[in-house]
C-alpha cells in the first residue's frame, strides 16, 4: 500500500444536492470520471456534465422503486478490491470491474422524516440500504478509497487533491473513513431508536446513541480534561439549538449550567408572568416571579446575592433593556432567553465577555425524552423526569389546609425542588425562593442550610426577621422522620409540600399538626443526582 493514491473514478449518489454541481464540475476539471444514480445523475447532466449511469456499469436497471440500484458486484467490487493484491486485480480484470477511488454519498433523509413526524410507511421508505452498504465498503477499503458523507467535506477533499496533484494521503482517507463509520452508526441508531418507539419497547435489548459535533471545548469540568459538545438531533429548544449573539466561547461548565437554568425557568409559562432563574454549579441560587421581568430578576438575585456572582441567568421572556441593565451590574457568565430587544442587545454589547444566547422559544417541560449517565462498564438510561403536579393532584393530609396564596407558593417551590440536587429543601415566599438547601446527605441538613440562606437574605436586605418566616417548603422526597419537617417549622415555615410515602408518614403528619403546619402530598418524588 502506498500513502498517496490517485482519484480517477468517482461514484456520486446523494439525497442532499447542496454543493453537488460545484463538486461535480471540480472533479471533472481534474479529469475524474463520474458515475452516478437516479436524481443525482440527472442533476449533474442538467448542469452539462458527462456522467455514466450505474445501471450502465452493472448491466441492470434500477428496480423496485429504486430499492435496488447499487447492490451489485460491479459496484462493490470496485470499492472493495485491494489494488495491491494480485488475486483481486485478476478478478477485476476477469469480470470487467473498474476501480472506484471516490465515493460521495449522503443518505436518504430518515432523520428529517422523523422530525416532521412522517407516517410509518414513509419512514420505512426513508431507510437507506444501498448507501450505507457502499459507505461501509469504501470505508473498509480506505487504504485506496475515499468516502465523503458530509457536504462540508467537499471543499476539504478538493484541497487535498490540489495539494497532492490529484491524489489523497492515507491519513486523509483514514480520517474520512472514521467519519463515514460514525455517520452510518448514527443513521442506524436513529432507525433502531425510532423502531423501538414505534413498537413500544421501553428497554430494547440494544440501545444506540449518536451525536454530531457542535463544538470542541477548551477543556472539560477541569483544565486537565478534554471535552467536546455534541448535539443529538432532537432540536429541543435550549442551549444546543440557541444562537449565541455575543460573548466568549461557551465552556463545558457554561453549557451544563445554562441547560440546567433554562430547563428550570421553562417550568414557568410566560402567560403566568415573568420568571427568572439564577444558577450556579447546576443548582438554583435564586428563582422568582414578578410583575415585570426586572422585578423577577431582582427578586431572584436577592435570594443569594453572593452565589449569583458568576452565575447563569435564564429568563422565560425576551430580555428587555431594564433587565439587561440590572444584569450588567454584576459579573454574569451567561444569559439565556427566548429573545432580546435591540436596546437590551446594545446594553450587553458593552460587556464583550458576557455570553447572550437566544432560543426563540421555550421547551415544553413535559416533553418526553431520555437521560443517560455513564457508569463503570455501562450506561444508565431512564425517561426524563417530566412529572408534573397541579393543584387538583395534591392531597391535603393535615388538619389545616393551605390557603390559596400558600398553595401557589407550594407549587412554585415544588417546581424548583425538581431541579435542585438531592437532598433538596426549598423555602419560597410570595413567588420567590428565600432559601435553597441542595445536595446534602441528610434532609435535615438541607433544611438547616435553606434556613441559614433565608436568614442571610434577610440580613442582606436589612430585614428584622428571617425570610423563612411564613414560607412554603418543598422537599423533593418524603421526610423519613419528623426531624426535617420540624427543622423547617423552627425556621418559620407554615406549609409543606412533599411526596409522602414514608413508613413514618403518620408520625410526620402528627408533627405537622402539632406545629400548626398545613401539608400536602404529591405522590411523586423528584430525586436529582
Curated annotation (Swiss-Prot):
MGS-like domain location: 2-149
Family affiliation: Belongs to the PurH family.
MF-aspect GO terms: IMP cyclohydrolase activity; phosphoribosylaminoimidazolecarboxamide formyltransferase activity
Domain comment in the entry: The IMP cyclohydrolase activity resides in the N-terminal region.
Catalytic activity: (6R)-10-formyltetrahydrofolate + 5-amino-1-(5-phospho-beta-D-ribosyl)imidazole-4-carboxamide = 5-formamido-1-(5-phospho-D-ribosyl)imidazole-4-carboxamide + (6S)-5,6,7,8-tetrahydrofolate; IMP + H2O = 5-formamido-1-(5-phospho-D-ribosyl)imidazole-4-carboxamide
Name under which the protein is recorded: Bifunctional purine biosynthesis protein PurH
GO biological process: 'de novo' IMP biosynthetic process
InterPro entries on file: AICAR_Tfase_dup_dom_sf, Cytidine_deaminase-like, MGS-like_dom, MGS-like_dom_sf, PurH-like
Enzyme Commission no: 2.1.2.3, 3.5.4.10
HAMAP family per UniProt: PurH
One term under GO cellular component: cytosol
Keyword Repeat among UniProt keywords: no
Hydrolase among keywords: yes
Pathway the protein acts in: Purine metabolism; IMP biosynthesis via de novo pathway; 5-formamido-1-(5-phospho-D-ribosyl)imidazole-4-carboxamide from 5-amino-1-(5-phospho-D-ribosyl)imidazole-4-carboxamide (10-formyl THF route): step 1/1; Purine metabolism; IMP biosynthesis via de novo pathway; IMP from 5-formamido-1-(5-phospho-D-ribosyl)imidazole-4-carboxamide: step 1/1
Gene3D superfamilies on file: 3.40.140.20, Methylglyoxal synthase-like domain (3.40.50.1380)
Keyword annotations: Hydrolase, Multifunctional enzyme, Purine biosynthesis, Transferase
Biological classification of the source: Bacteria, Pseudomonadati, Pseudomonadota, Alphaproteobacteria, Rhodobacterales
Amino acid at each position: 500500500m502506498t500513502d498517496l493514491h490517485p482519484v480517477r473514478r468517482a461514484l456520486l449518489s446523494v439525497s442532499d444536492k447542496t454543493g453537488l454541481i460545484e463538486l461535480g464540475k471540480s472533479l471533472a476539471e481534474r479529469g475524474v470520471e463520474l458515475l452516478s444514480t437516479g436524481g443525482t445523475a440527472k442533476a449533474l447532466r442538467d448542469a452539462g456534465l458527462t456522467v455514466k449511469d450505474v445501471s450502465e456499469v452493472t448491466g441492470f436497471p434500477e428496480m423496485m422503486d429504486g430499492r435496488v440500484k447499487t447492490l451489485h458486484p460491479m459496484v462493490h467490487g470496485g470499492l472493495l478490491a485491494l489494488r495491491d493484491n494480485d488475486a483481486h486485480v485478476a478478478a477485476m480484470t476477469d469480470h470487467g470491474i473498474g476501480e472506484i477511488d471516490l465515493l460521495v454519498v449522503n443518505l436518504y433523509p430518515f432523520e428529517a422524516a422523523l422530525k416532521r413526524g412522517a407516517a410509518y410507511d414513509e419512514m420505512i421508505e426513508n431507510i437507506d440500504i444501498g448507501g450505507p452498504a457502499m459507505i461501509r465498503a469504501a470505508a473498509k477499503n480506505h487504504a485506496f478509497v475515499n468516502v465523503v458523507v458530509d457536504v462540508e467535506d467537499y471543499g476539504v477533499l478538493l484541497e487535498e487533491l490540489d495539494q497532492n496533484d490529484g491524489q489523497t494521503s492515507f491519513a486523509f482517507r483514514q480520517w474520512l473513513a472514521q467519519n463515514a463509520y460514525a455517520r452510518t452508526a448514527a443513521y442506524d441508531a436513529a432507525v433502531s431508536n425510532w423502531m423501538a418507539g414505534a413498537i413500544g419497547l421501553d428497554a430494547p435489548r440494544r440501545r444506540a446513541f449518536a451525536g454530531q459535533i457542535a463544538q470542541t471545548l477548551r477543556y472539560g469540568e477541569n483544565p486537565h480534561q478534554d471535552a467536546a459538545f455534541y448535539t443529538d438531533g432532537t432540536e429541543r429548544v435550549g442551549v444546543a439549538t440557541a444562537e449565541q449573539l455575543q460573548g466568549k466561547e461557551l465552556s463545558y461548565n457554561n453549557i451544563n449550567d445554562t441547560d440546567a437554568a433554562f430547563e428550570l425557568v421553562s417550568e414557568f409559562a410566560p402567560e403566568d408572568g415573568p420568571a427568572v432563574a439564577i444558577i450556579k454549579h447546576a443548582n438554583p441560587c435564586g428563582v422568582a416571579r414578578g410583575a415585570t421581568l426586572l422585578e423577577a430578576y431582582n427578586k431572584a438575585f436577592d435570594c443569594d446575592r453572593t452565589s449569583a456572582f458568576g452565575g447563569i441567568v435564564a429568563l422565560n421572556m425576551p430580555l428587555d433593556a431594564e433587565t439587561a441593565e440590572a444584569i450588567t451590574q454584576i459579573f454574569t457568565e451567561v444569559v439565556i432567553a427566548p429573545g432580546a430587544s435591540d436596546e437590551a442587545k446594545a446594553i450587553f454589547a458593552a460587556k464583550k465577555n458576557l455570553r447572550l444566547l437566544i432560543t426563540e422559544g421555550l421547551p415544553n417541560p413535559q416533553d418526553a425524552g431520555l437521560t443517560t449517565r455513564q457508569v463503570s462498564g455501562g450506561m444508565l438510561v431512564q425517561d426524563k423526569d417530566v412529572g408534573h403536579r397541579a393543584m387538583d393532584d395534591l392531597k391535603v393530609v393535615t388538619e389545616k389546609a393551605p390557603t390559596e396564596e400558600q398553595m401557589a407558593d407550594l407549587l412554585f417551590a415544588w417546581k424548583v425542588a425538581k431541579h435542585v440536587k438531592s437532598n433538596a429543601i426549598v423555602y419560597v415566599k410570595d413567588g420567590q425562593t428565600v432559601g435553597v438547601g441542595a445536595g446534602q446527605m441528610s434532609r435535615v441538613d438541607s433544611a438547616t442550610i435553606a434556613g441559614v440562606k433565608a436568614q442571610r437574605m434577610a440580613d442582606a436586605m436589612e430585614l428584622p426577621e428571617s425570610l423563612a418566616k411564613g414560607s412554603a417548603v418543598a422537599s423533593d422526597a418524603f421526610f423519613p422522620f419528623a426531624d426535617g419537617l420540624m427543622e423547617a417549622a423552627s425556621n418559620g415555615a407554615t406549609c409543606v409540600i412533599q411526596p409522602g410515602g414514608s413508613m413514618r408518614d403518620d408520625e410526620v403528619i402528627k408533627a405537622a399538626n402539632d406545629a400548626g403546619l398545613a401539608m400536602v402530598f404529591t405522590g411523586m418524588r423528584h430525586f436529582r443526582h
